[in-house]
């Protein structure tokens, strides 16, 4: 027998190298085979409910790292709730209608307008479902636990029917109407867009300063006066029908030196404009309030038969321009709102493809709208006073990445103004994480216009509206309920397969159709109406779910997307929000803080991360970042996270190895019988349990990450395990000292494994497979630990906090001795502590082997008054470090004066000799194989 065999060196097959890319799919297969999701739901049946509603990602392409952040975050929450005694099902969903799928088919050479519509829509459907399958596999590879066999998809007939019922309820209340006001129009998509489909980019535009000649000055201005206006969209001058001034603003009539014309501009902008126009000097002829100029008539700059009326508007400012806004009601929301008050013509001179229409004039007809600036400049002639290039923020179609325009076209709208205050009241009842989300959503709802819900596309849910012979729109409850039933049975495809009369209830009549003829709407619904009604199609109808949901969790862009649309439809139909709480997250950027894009080559694929590092590393990264703000990720950052993971894994491996001979049923030492340092660690660990439990409740994953890393590296590795290994290795296997520490080891190991399962499910499942004394087959079926408190807890914490200060001071003294070559390792030291009475009382109260705790071989405690001048001194304590006396014990590696060669060929100290002689009689009788001496 070898001497080292008398040591209790921890043994385990749990590998240091994780091998996550290979092992994780094996665990996922085991979970699926064991129907783990189903079993967890069965375990929690009848318990308090927690229902997170999954915002549906768009079914197109593999998932990106933003998807991963979102789904992993949801998985962490749902897993933590499930393990904390909540009935917490997770039904994943997909958004499956919309333009991107049409664009994919177009790139494949499929021409929608040249084929049967039903056949085309079936191709869209099949493509969408193939993308659902692809993304489902991607999410499962991340270890996300969900009801993957029963997701919701917005193309499902039942979902479509429930969506129609939401529409019908809103129509019944009068919230659906048709109007021809300006909407965001994407010429690249040939469709109207909702606010949620807009993104902004900075672009350069040519702005023009020009003048309209006064035609009828109403006795205030003479006909030799010109009113100066400014535009950043020259094409809209073709549809200009008015000039808007601020009613309370001051305007001056000025005559530049050498000019026979006089001009009207805002007083507050005159100096800057004079510089732009090259007016070296000018004479001020008159001053007027904007309200005085109302109803003055001017001529259109080149189409002089068109009159442009001076009108009043509160949206006019002195921030830029001339203080006078040219007004084209067909091309702007403010223009429309103020123009209709004065009954101005709503002229639209750009078609659905962005081409100038015939009514723009022969010089413009057929030209692309943003290419006509040179023509406008030419037509303005000497009425053009200046032009300049400006850089400004401009709206773009978020899908095609092309600029859009405001354009008045007949559309269907969902009113927001009719019940806006009700929505705002519901926002105030909702909990927001982070808290600033409330203000953001509140302001968006407060300031938004009505919602344009019609789209001029094919792949989507049809608007269930019919038209009588006289043009009356029909969307009564009887009709929409019937359409919903048809969709539920056949899918929305039936809308395109049957004539209008066959889609109406049997025997349906309407006074507007004396001949019994009807037509149907050909527009489809905005896809945000699809996902925005999911509270009805999922939470309100699926078994084991509830409405309103406990939580919606999405990216911060969803304040104007899903959070917004869901809130509108839910309040419209039922008078309350669809959620009790909202959690929003920032965007994922690259390691330099830049947006990810294919062109930059900085995209991080979750699948690539899973192949290189493993999904648990990506999950740990999610827990490590502050998702209240934008977060960064790169392979380098993931490498750093992987290093942190390695530290956690190897620490837990140490605990596994050193509890391999520990049976909790027979070897556990009661808290009252633990050593004081073991009690201290038990208390510290239970504080960690409380911290993590609270952080899960607050959805603060980063707090969990920081707390765990600090506990593992500081409290365990750098303190407790640093000296505890000397006890568990050296003391007799069944000794009280060893079993005490193993009790703490095992308690920490089991509970921290449970606590980490929502974040690192693959790793904790592997650890759990080595814990043979735990009854649950999978850690995911276990319950979360509950933090305990102990008698005299605060006193114990205070005493050990004071010791930690003393320990740090002792380490500084040992380091100085090491630098002075007095010792090498700290175990070579004889440390003398010169202590005040207060420190002596502390050391006595600790009731511990202080030499063991400080990892020195020998320790002496003396009076502070006796400290020599060269002692390393601190307040109340001083240290002298000398080389320990004696030889190194081959077994304990400590220097001890009792160390000597024993008759059984072991060079050991008395303490080790006693352990050997009491526990290894055969080795004592036969002698050990070899000795270093």
From Swiss-Prot:
Family, as annotated: Belongs to the class-I aminoacyl-tRNA synthetase family. IleS type 1 subfamily.
Enzyme Commission numbers on file: 6.1.1.5
Gene Ontology cellular component terms for the protein in this record: cytosol
InterPro entries per record: aa-tRNA-synth_I_CS, aa-tRNA-synth_Ia, Anticodon_Ile_BEm, Ile-tRNA-ligase, Ile-tRNA-ligase_type1, Ile-tRNA_ligase, M/V/L/I-tRNA-synth_anticd-bd, Rossmann-like_a/b/a_fold
Gene label: ileS
GO molecular function, one term: tRNA binding
Subcellular localization(s) per the UniProt record: Cytoplasm
Motif ('HIGH' region): 57-67
Transmembrane region(s): none
Reactions accelerated catalytically: tRNA(Ile) + L-isoleucine + ATP = L-isoleucyl-tRNA(Ile) + AMP + diphosphate
Binding site for ATP: 598
Assembly information from the UniProt record: Monomer.
Short sequence motif named 'KMSKS' region, residue ranges: 595-599
Name listed for the protein in its UniProt record: Isoleucine--tRNA ligase
Domain of life: Bacteria
Positions contributing to L-isoleucyl-5'-AMP binding: 554
GO terms of biological process kind: isoleucyl-tRNA aminoacylation
Keyword terms of this UniProt record: Aminoacyl-tRNA synthetase, ATP-binding, Cytoplasm, Ligase, Nucleotide-binding, Protein biosynthesis
Domain free text: IleRS has two distinct active sites: one for aminoacylation and one for editing. The misactivated valine is translocated from the active site to the editing site, which sterically excludes the correctly activated isoleucine. The single editing site contains two valyl binding pockets, one specific for each substrate (Val-AMP or Val-tRNA(Ile)).
Role: Catalyzes the attachment of isoleucine to tRNA(Ile). As IleRS can inadvertently accommodate and process structurally similar amino acids such as valine, to avoid such errors it has two additional distinct tRNA(Ile)-dependent editing activities. One activity is designated as 'pretransfer' editing and involves the hydrolysis of activated Val-AMP. The other activity is designated 'posttransfer' editing and involves deacylation of mischarged Val-tRNA(Ile).
Pfam families hit by this protein: Anticodon_1, tRNA-synt_1
Top-tier EC class: ligase
């Amino acid at each position: 027998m070898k001497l080292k065999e008398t040591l209790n060196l921890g043994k385990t097959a749990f590998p240091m190298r994780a091998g996550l890319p290979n092992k994780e799919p094996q665990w996922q297969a085991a979970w699926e085979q064991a129907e783990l999701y189903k079993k967890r739901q069965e375990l929690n049946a009848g318990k308090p409910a927690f229902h997170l509603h999954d915002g549906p990602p768009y079914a197109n392409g593999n998932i990106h790292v933003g998807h991963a952040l979102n789904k992993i975050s949801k998985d962490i929450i749902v897993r933590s709730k499930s393990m904390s005694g909540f009935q917490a099902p997770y039904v994943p969903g997909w958004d499956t209608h919309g333009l991107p799928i049409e664009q994919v088919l177009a790139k494949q050479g499929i021409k929608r307008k040249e084929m049967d519509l039903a056949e085309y829509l079936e191709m869209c459907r099949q493509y969408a479902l193939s993308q659902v399958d692809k993304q489902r596999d991607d999410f499962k590879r991340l270890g996300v636990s969900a009801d993957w066999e029963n997701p919701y998809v917005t193309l499902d007939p039942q979902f479509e029917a429930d969506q129609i019922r939401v529409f019908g309820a809103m129509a019944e209340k009068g919230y659906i109407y048709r109007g021809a006001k300006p909407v965001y129009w994407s010429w690249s998509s040939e469709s109207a867009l909702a606010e949620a489909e807009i993104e902004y980019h900075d672009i350069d535009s040519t702005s023009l300063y020009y003048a309209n000649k006064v035609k009828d000055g109403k006795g205030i201005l003479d006909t030799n006066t010109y009113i100066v206006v400014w535009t950043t969209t020259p094409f809209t001058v073709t549809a200009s029908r008015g000039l808007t001034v601020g009613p309370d603003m001051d305007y001056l009539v000025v005559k530049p030196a050498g000019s026979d014309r006089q001009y009207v501009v805002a007083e507050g902008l005159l100096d800057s404009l004079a510089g732009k126009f090259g007016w070296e000097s000018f004479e001020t002829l008159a001053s007027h309030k904007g309200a005085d100029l109302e109803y003055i008539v001017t001529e259109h700059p080149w189409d002089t038969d068109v009159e442009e009326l001076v009108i009043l508007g509160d949206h006019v400012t002195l921030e830029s321009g001339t203080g006078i806004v040219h007004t084209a009601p067909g091309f702007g929301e403010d223009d429309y709102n103020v123009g209709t008050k004065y009954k101005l013509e709503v002229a639209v001179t750009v078609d659905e493809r962005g081409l100038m229409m015939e009514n723009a004039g022969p010089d413009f007809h057929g030209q692309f709208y943003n290419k006509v600036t040179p023509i406008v400049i030419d037509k303005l002639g000497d009425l053009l006073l200046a032009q300049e290039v400006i850089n400004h923020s401009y709206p773009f179609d978020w899908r095609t990445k092309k600029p859009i325009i405001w354009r008045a076209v007949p559309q269907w709208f969902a009113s927001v103004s009719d019940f806006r205050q009700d929505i705002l009241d519901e926002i105030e009842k909702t909990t927001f994480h982070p808290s600033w989300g409330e203000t953001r959503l509140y302001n968006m709802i407060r300031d938004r216009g009505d919602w344009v819900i019609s789209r001029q596309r094919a792949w989507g849910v049809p608007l269930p509206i019919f038209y009588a012979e006289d043009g009356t729109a029909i969307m009564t409850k009887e009709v929409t309920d019937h359409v919903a039933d048809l969709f539920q049975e056949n899918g929305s495809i039936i809308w395109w397969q049957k004539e209008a009369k066959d889609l109406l209830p049997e025997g349906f009549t309407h006074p507007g159709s004396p001949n019994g003829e009807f037509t149907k709407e050909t527009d489809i619904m905005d896809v945000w109406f699809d996902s925005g009604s999911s509270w009805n199609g999922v939470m309100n109808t699926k078994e084991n779910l509830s409405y309103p949901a406990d939580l919606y969790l999405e990216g911060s862009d969803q304040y104007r997307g899903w959070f917004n649309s869901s809130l509108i439809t839910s309040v419209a139909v039922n008078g309350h929000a669809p959620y009790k709480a909202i959690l929003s997250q920032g965007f994922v950027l690259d390691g330099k803080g830049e947006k990810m894009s294919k062109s930059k080559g900085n995209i991080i694929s979750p699948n690539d991360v899973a192949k290189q590092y493993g999904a648990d590393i990506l999950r740990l990264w999610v827990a490590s970042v502050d998702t209240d703000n934008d977060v960064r990720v790169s392979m380098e950052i993931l490498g750093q996270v992987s290093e942190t993971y390695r530290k956690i894994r190897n620490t837990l491996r140490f605990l596994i190895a050193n509890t391999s001979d520990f049976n909790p049923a027979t070897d556990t030492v009661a808290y009252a019988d633990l050593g004081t340092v073991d009690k201290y660690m038990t208390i510290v660990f239970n504080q960690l349990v409380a911290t993590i439990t609270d952080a899960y409740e607050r959805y603060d994953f980063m707090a969990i990450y920081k707390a765990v890393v600090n506990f593992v590296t500081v409290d365990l590795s750098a303190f407790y395990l640093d000296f505890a290994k000397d006890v568990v290795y050296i003391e007799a296997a069944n000794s009280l000292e060893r079993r005490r520490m193993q009790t703490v080891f095992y308690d920490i190991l089991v509970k921290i494994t449970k606590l980490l399962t929502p974040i690192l499910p693959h790793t904790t499942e592997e650890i759990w497979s080595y814990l043979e004394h735990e009854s649950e087959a999978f850690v995911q079926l276990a319950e979360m630990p509950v933090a305990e408190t102990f008698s005299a807890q605060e006193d114990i914490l205070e005493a050990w906090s004071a010791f930690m200060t003393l320990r740090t001071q002792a380490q500084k003294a040992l380091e100085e001795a090491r630098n002075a070559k007095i010792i090498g390792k700290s175990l070579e030291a004889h440390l003398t502590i010169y202590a005040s009475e207060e420190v002596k009382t502390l050391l006595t109260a600790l009731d511990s082997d202080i030499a063991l705790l400080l990892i020195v071989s020998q320790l002496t405690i003396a009076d502070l008054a006796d400290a020599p001048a060269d002692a390393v001194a601190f307040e109340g304590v001083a240290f002298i470090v000398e080389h320990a006396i004696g030889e190194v014990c081959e077994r304990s590696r400590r220097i001890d004066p009792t160390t000597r060669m024993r008759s059984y060929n072991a060079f050991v100290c008395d303490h080790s000799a006693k352990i050997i002689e009491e526990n290894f009689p055969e080795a004592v009788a036969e002698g050990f194989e070899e000795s270093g001496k």
